[in-house]
Amino acid sequence: MFRAQQNAFDDAVAKATDENLTSENWEYILDVCDKVAAEESGAKDAVAALIKRLAHRNANVQLYTLELGNALAQNCGPKIHRELASRSFTDALLRLANDRNTHQQVKAKILERMQEWTEMFASNPDFGIMEQAYMKLKTQNPNLQPPSKPGKREITEADRQKEEEELQMALALSIREKPSTAPHPQAESSASAAAAATTPTGAASAGQAQPAASQAVPSGTSAATVSRVRALFDFQPSEPGELQFRKGDVIAVLESVYKDWWKGSLRGQTGIFPLNYVEKLPDPTVEELQREAQMEAEVFGQIKNVEKLLTLLSTRSSEPNVQDNEEITALYHSTLAIRPKLIELIGKYSQKKDEFTQLNEKFIKARRDYEALLEASMSHPAQPQYGRPGQPQYPYPGPGAPMGYPPGGPQPDQRYFSPRPQGHMYPPTSQSPGPRNHTPPAAAPYQQAPSHPPAQPQQHTAPDAYPPQHHRPESTYDHPQELSTSVYDSPVEQRPPYPGAQIPAAIHQHFQQQQQQQQDYSPSVYSPDESKPPGTQQVPYPATPAANQPPPMHQPPPVPGAAAAPTPYPVNAPGASYQAYKPPQGGPASNPASFYQ
């Protein structure tokens, strides 16, 4: 009749802070947060339910209640902040922290949460009650506050040398212990000696290992002799690269980074942590491993009893009083004793499962990176170093260069033009007109063509600009003579040669094919232009069809008579000396047309 009104949040908060939970159930926690945000008086009712759960004597319930309050503070806004900073809630926290029966871990968690809430509410002066309560608890319990983080001092060379020596000593001891692993009476003593050798704190036996583990890591201990450490306090990283952990976490030690900071790995995360926040865990001895294996065997041996109990309960569920059945009662009590061990094994193998999963993910990532690099290297192979080397261009040798083969020895069968003597390498631009529009002067003598013109002119393409191979006699007026020409060609070309890099590829290929088909060439000698000064000569270019030559602009030479045949044009035999051109002797009245008949 006079019972207090039932709080709508009691059931939801009790469900989220159940003592049978092995860890925080965030599904239930978020359900409470959603319910607080949906109702007008949800913040006040939720905090009232939290105060009730803080009075529970179970330490797990108290820890889950503090975690639920922190989740509400982060998700439900100023309304819940006002209720958390109220006098009733802070007094409940102080009362629980000052109780001598409260677990030490619960007291440390209360101090940690009050510090976070003080920093969270610092912007609003109306929530100063939380700060006052935090300072009061901090003053009354100075031992609850975690130690300050040490400074990050660089490791000296002497420290690294000492760490290396300790590592070599530990390796030598481990090698020395291998023969003693056989079952004989000295097995236990050797294991204890190994633990004492690798533990500077002096734990000499399995019985002393547990007290030694409760001590913090000494400052002189190196990471080479320690493989695992256990967290003594919760650590929140304040700088990038620091490892976050909670009290009780076992951290795998990797290496020393600073003087009082080590690098470790926990739940797939790698970072540095301070040594005064952790304690050293010695490697498990043979007795500890045997004890752990025996405990696991006992737990797995009770599986049959659990299944039998479930079968009996399902078949005899219609009986009114189950307590009268002695078999069911005995099975229930025998299986109830293994529950703490089962929870411990669940936590152990859950952590191992997470570690193996993270290791598998790292391996998969490394394999994918390797395959990507391998495919990239195969899709872009290195260019071969062999092949036809590019031939240098030698249109004219420089001053003082020897006349003959280019550097590197003779080249394949290619004919070329003899170089000009030193002197006029290129025509002066101020005295010579454009190569396309240049015509010989009117006073220049006409050059006589061969007496027997070919029946069918053969078209020639421009040769490539590769360096020539064979020499031929030079003309008396240093004009290069042309080879393998069977039509009337001008010894002085009227256009400059192509540069080596600008010769069309089709012309170059056609000229090479023509050189392979023609094996024997007869050089023809032409008369040089005697009236033209050397300074006005253009750079020659080989073999152009006669149809492209301009008509002569001067008088032809006289012909001696109608019956008289023109003097044949001399042809040099291979190896013969150069024969200069001699004009035929004829009168000025001879008919010039007879020359072309």
Swiss-Prot record:
SMART domains: SH3, VHS. Residues 162-181 form the UIM domain. It holds the Pfam family VHS. Residues 151-163, 471-481 have a biased composition (Basic and acidic residues). Residues 16-145 form the VHS domain. Residues 392-410, 548-560 have a biased composition (Pro residues). Residues 224-283 form the SH3 domain. InterPro entries: ENTH_VHS, GAT_dom, SH3-like_dom_sf, SH3_domain, STAM, VHS_dom. It is found in: Endosome membrane. GO terms for cellular component: endosome membrane; ESCRT-0 complex. It is a peripheral membrane protein. Keywords: Endosome, Membrane, Protein transport, SH3 domain, Transport. Component of the ESCRT-0 complex which is the sorting receptor for ubiquitinated cargo proteins at the multivesicular body (MVB). Belongs to the STAM family. This is Class E vacuolar protein-sorting machinery protein hse1.
